[in-house]
């Protein structure tokens, strides 16, 4: 369960960083 949450966070982190960098 927690593994899937961490995976989703790891997937969303790069997009979040790119959004902040914009």
UniProtKB/Swiss-Prot annotation:
Q: Which UniProt keywords apply?
A: Amidation, Antibiotic, Antimicrobial, Secreted
> Cellular component terms, GO, for this chain's entry?
extracellular region
Q: Which residues are annotated with the PTM Lysine amide?
A: 22
The free-text tissue note of the record is: Expressed by the skin glands.
Q: Where in the cell is it found?
A: Secreted
- Any single biological process term in GO: defense response to Gram-negative bacterium
Q: What is its main location?
A: secreted
Question: Which superkingdom?
Answer: Eukaryota
Segments spanning the bilayer are none
Please state which protein family the record places this protein in: Belongs to the frog skin active peptide (FSAP) family. Brevinin subfamily.
What is its biological role?
A: Antimicrobial peptide. Active against Gram-negative bacterium E.coli (MIC=6 uM) and against Gram-positive bacterium S.aureus (MIC=12.5 uM).
Q: What's the name of the protein?
A: Brevinin-1OKc
């Amino acid at each position: 369960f927690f593994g899937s949450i961490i995976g989703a966070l790891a997937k969303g982190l790069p997009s979040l960083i790119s959004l902040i960098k914009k």
